[in-house]
Amino acid sequence: MSTQGFLKPRSIEVEPVGAHHAKIVMEPFERGYGHTLGNALRRILLSSMTGYAPTEVQMTGVVHEYSTIAGVREDVVDILLNLKGVVFKLHNRDEVTLVLRKNGAGAVVASDIELPHDVEIINPDHLICNLTDAGKIEMQVKVEKGRGYVPGNVRALSEDRTHTIGRIVLDASFSPVRRVSYAVESARVEQRTDLDKLVLDIETNGVISPEEAVRQAARILMDQISVFAALEGAGDAYEPPVRGTPQIDPVLLRPVDDLELTVRSANCLKAENIYYIGDLIQRTENELLKTPNLGRKSLNEIKEVLAARGLTLGMKLENWPPLGLERP
């Protein structure tokens, strides 16, 4: 079926509303496509954007989250809640452990955290706690890259680490998108008045811009539905493939970069000449664990993203690599 008769947006406008807040207006769409695409993009924006969050904390003199610290007005629960509000951005790394030390009366804010050159805090004035004259606070904060919302108890079980006294595992909300809504209005092209205008209202925490968030969401949506493109050209009648020439799923021809793995995992795979998803799924778990710098955590990440696409490790492919497949 040809799609040439379908209208595509001719106009995309970005209307700034405030800091990290914008309305993105796209028109025209065929009637009904405003809701179809608006709802899909909204769900992806809320659930699937990659961001950064504090995941573990260790405070000097603190055994558990229900403790109090002498000279600190807030209890540990309030300090942890405030710490979750700090917006971190990591450049070219997937995790980092940061140190916060301060004593003497006054407010402790996000800018008091000691940062390496490749870590940034978007809201440096964010309050963490208040100290009295004799107050002192010292802590280590682990920040990680992730997606969606991961409860602390789930992370603690999945990582299978030896429990350290005083190590507090946090519920992590990685999403950089704070709010998303969409509206569908009427649009007109020449004599047609039954068209849709899609208005996306997006607010982020500053790690990414609203425009970049939409671009990422669109790429995720395209990647997820690309598997259906294999049905194109089949016509109304089913034609079985010619014997001896197995058809290759187009998803397997996509680069591993499309899996949106962490930088560490992606670099480990490329070092082993694994450039395409088809290369990856033919490796076994044991083979990947022998890869330098690729540990159990990276392996679990790879298995999860493959499972989301209906794939597993250790699969066998005939006629791989296909003729003409370019290697970097």
From Swiss-Prot:
Locate the transmembrane regions by residue number. none
Kindly state which keywords UniProt assigns to this record, in alphabetical order. DNA-directed RNA polymerase, Nucleotidyltransferase, Transcription, Transferase
**Residue ranges, annotated region (Alpha N-terminal domain (alpha-NTD)):** 1-232
Q: Where is this region: Alpha C-terminal domain (alpha-CTD)?
A: 248-328
The GO molecular function terms of this record are: DNA binding; DNA-directed RNA polymerase activity; protein dimerization activity
A Pfam family annotated for this UniProt entry: RNA_pol_A_bac
EC?
Answer: 2.7.7.6
Cellular component terms, GO, for this chain's entry? cytoplasm; DNA-directed RNA polymerase complex
Query: What's its catalytic activity?
Result: RNA(n) + a ribonucleoside 5'-triphosphate = RNA(n+1) + diphosphate
This chain's function reads: DNA-dependent RNA polymerase catalyzes the transcription of DNA into RNA using the four ribonucleoside triphosphates as substrates.
Notes concerning its domains: The N-terminal domain is essential for RNAP assembly and basal transcription, whereas the C-terminal domain is involved in interaction with transcriptional regulators and with upstream promoter elements.
Give the matching NCBIfam families.
PRK05182.1-2, PRK05182.2-5, rpoA
Q: How does the record describe its quaternary structure?
A: Homodimer. The RNAP catalytic core consists of 2 alpha, 1 beta, 1 beta' and 1 omega subunit. When a sigma factor is associated with the core the holoenzyme is formed, which can initiate transcription.
| HAMAP family per UniProt | RNApol_bact_RpoA
Name listed for the protein in its UniProt record: DNA-directed RNA polymerase subunit alpha
Species whose genome carries this gene: Bordetella pertussis (strain Tohama I / ATCC BAA-589 / NCTC 13251)
